Amino acid sequence: MILLENVKKIYKAKSGDVTAVDNANLKIDKGEIFGVIGYSGAGKSSLIRLFNQLEKPTSGQITIANRVISAITGSELRKARQEIGMIFQHFNLLWSRTVRENIEFPLEIAGVDKAKRRKRVDELIHLVGLEGRGDAYPSQLSGGQKQRVGIARALANNPQVLLCDEATSALDPETTDQILDLLLDINKRLGLTIVLITHEMHVIRKICNRVAVMEKGKIVETGPVLDVFRNPQQDITKRFVQQLTDSEDTNETIESLIEKYPDGKVVRLQFIGEAVERPVLQRLMQRSDIEVSILQGNIAQTNNGSYGSLVVHLNGEETAIQQAIEGIHQDQVELEVIAHG
């Protein structure tokens, strides 16, 4: 569906060339939700703007739906852009137009007749849950409602691809989840390919099938979201995963608990997919002559399955503890010793 081959974007500056995207290679399948995550300055905004040619690549090739979009210009590019919708962090609505008129705007530009425009706008207002707000102006809407207008407008011309440029960064957590649920619903209903960029791992976890991690213009890691959660390879990826699995407060709590358990071992168990539902601790206590205390635990649901972790204290004879650890490995649960007496 979408293919990036050795794509590079270099900006000219007085202080010298700035490489925003450095030899990016990506393949995004039709109908998937693909996330790109990175901190500020990683190059992700430059990358997503290459998809619809708001930015031209310095080198490399971009293919969308078997069309080399990086090689076309003029009317052909304008037509291709109608098949690529985009929503933005700050909505980019026309403040002098109503909700209906904002959604209708790209249809006007495309030359769609008035009756068809009206019908399409009605469909989109229903799709994004804005019934009864069609005559309101952007200033009368909440942040979440404004983004719903942005989504409806982006879908006006029935695009094959929807680009999301930090679409939830300006929203509160509850509204963020509502918008993410809407994007999930649209993806399932329309079979729409969604590419989103974000600096929040929560967004990736909640709706993405696969993720690419960017750092200093380079794509340093890609893979299914659950695989990245389970086994992050790069330091930056590990930091993003820790946003959800290890908060600063959690780490401080674990450190204080470790001080209370000077004997035995404190271990972290990681559960992936079906392993989340296994009675691992019950089996451990049944077959081992040790004491088991749960210090901390959490579970997260990704679009590919569940991911969870437990921090537990194992206390008893050293031989019994080692046998318990071997038993945990046999249950195909990943284990890390984080402290031992």
Swiss-Prot record:
The keyword Cell membrane applies. Keywords: Amino-acid transport, ATP-binding, Cell membrane, Membrane, Nucleotide-binding, Translocase, Transport. It is a peripheral membrane protein. Residues 2-241 form the ABC transporter domain. It is found in: Cell membrane. It holds the Pfam family ABC_tran. GO terms for cellular component: plasma membrane. The keyword Nucleus does not apply. GO terms for molecular function: ABC-type D-methionine transporter activity; ATP binding; ATP hydrolysis activity. CDD domains: ABC_MetN_methionine_transporter. The complex is composed of two ATP-binding proteins (MetN), two transmembrane proteins (MetI) and a solute-binding protein (MetQ). Belongs to the ABC transporter superfamily. Methionine importer (TC 3.A.1.24) family. This is Methionine import ATP-binding protein MetN 3. It comes from Bacillus cereus (strain ZK / E33L).
